[in-house]
Amino acid sequence: MRNRAFQFFFAVEIFLGLFLLAGCETMPSGIQQARVDAAQKIAAEPPGDYFIGHRYFKGSVFKFWGYVRKPGQPWSTAQLVVLNEKEKLAPDREKLSFGSDNNYEYKLYGNFSGQTVYEPASNGFYPEFVLKRYELISTNPAPIFKSQYSDRARAATGRFQIEKPE
């Protein structure tokens, strides 16, 4: 009887161990390589009087534009901004196709005004970026949000959740 109990508990331990290990998520090698390539590309960006912007459109709910970082800096340092479009309209607004450029990457020319703007849907304050001009870098840039390469993170990201780049 003792031997059967031992075999039963041993089998249960093996099953639970395999079950728990199957729940561990590893990043596919292609995505990992894309992230390494993106980090190398960022490190190679020449310094200058410009910024890199990643359009982050969350439906018609939120009124921020996207993430902006300095050249050569990782996306984890980027700031979520509201655009001041008095001098230049945002790319999607110029085309009257709001949000059509979601997840696009741009070279932005302009500056931070030093002002913060209240965005009521998120109940947050965001820095104001005064856009002077822009250049499209990519319509399909490397992923910067966990939800772009993790099914588990994508499932956990709700419509009203604001992601932060990694």
Question: Across the structure, where does each feature detected by a protein language model lie?
Answer:
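N-terminal hydrophobic targeting signals that begin at the initiator methionine
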Residues: 1-2, 25
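Bacterial N-terminal signal peptides that target proteins for export
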Residues: 2-12
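C-terminal motif of bacterial Sec signal peptides marking the signal peptidase cleavage site
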Residues: 20-23
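OB-fold and OB-like single-stranded nucleic-acid-recognition modules
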Residues: 26-166
